[in-house]
C-alpha cells in the first residue's frame, strides 16, 4: 500500500545508514570526492587551507542530508535561503556572528548564494587551480541540473592561451570561442558558467576579475536569459521538471549500479 510504503521510506531516511547515501550518491553527484585531491594555487588564493577544504565538503553533505531527512522539496537543491557553516566557512562566505568549529544551520544574509550550485564545493571542483572555468561550471549545470548531455569537445582544438588573450576571463573566452571548432561546445556551456563568475575558483564572492567589473549575464539552452547567480537560480527553478527528472535518473542509476536503458 502506498501509505505503508511512505512510512517505511521516511523511517529509512531517518536511519543512520542515510550517511552512506550522502557519502556515495552526493559524493558522486556533487563531486565531493574529487575535492580531497584538488590543489588550488595558494599563491593566488592565500586564504586556502585544509580546514576550509574540510568545511566546504561538510557543508554540502549536511545540506544534502537535511533535504533528504527532513523531507524538504528537492527544489531546495536549486535555491534555498539557508545553508550549514562553521566559523571557517562563514568567514569564507562573509556570514557574520558564527563562532566555533561546530556546524549549524544559518539563514543566508543575501541572495548571492542558495542551493548547491552556489556552494563552494561545486564552484571549487569545477574550477582550475588558478582561475575559474566557465566551461567546466557550465558543463556541470548542463548535465547535473538540466540533465542534458554535453557535446564532446572537437578533436585537436588548442587550449585557451592565457598569455595571448587580453581582458577578463569572459572576454578571453569569447575570443577563444571565435574559433568555429570551439564554438559548438562553448556556445552551449559557457553562457551557463558565466552566471557563476561572481565566485572565484575557491567559491568566494567577488565583484571584479583582475580589476575589471564582472559580467555575470548568461542564457539557458532554451534562450532564457539571466544576469547573475540570483537570477540564474530563478530561471533554473522555472525548469523544475527537467531537474526533477535529472535527479530521479541519477538516483535510479545509483541504486541499480548501471546506466539506464530506454526501450
Could you say what each language-model-derived stretch is?
Residues 258-263:
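Short, intrinsically disordered, charge-balanced linker/junction segments flanking boundaries
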